Amino acid sequence: MKYIINYVFTPIFLLISLNAYAEYKTTDFSKEEYQMVVNASGDYTDCLNESAMSQIEQQNDARVIADHAMKECATVLEELYDYLVSANYAPEAVRRLVGRSSNKASNKLLSNLMRFMAMKK
């Protein structure tokens, strides 16, 4: 019985589990998809900057300004996520890509805000 499980059922389960992941595309974006990722990242950065500038006179804490801007601009990255998932890319990979774009733009915004606040004093 042990040999039947090891040599019959285990390979079948392995093939089934591999087929579950085979339906997703790889990370090889088409030119249009790559351009959409680049544009969405730029739009997100622009949105963060515009939102932060509108809040800079009302708040004196850079972290609060950055948090508000990130919440206000989250829809840009959500649309990118939805598009790539609907284009049949793995949701985990898309989540990492979108998270990386978000982190990069947010860290840059926070750095710029802190620099601006220091110059303002």
PLM features: residue spans?
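Bacterial N-terminal signal peptides that target proteins for export
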Residues: 1-9
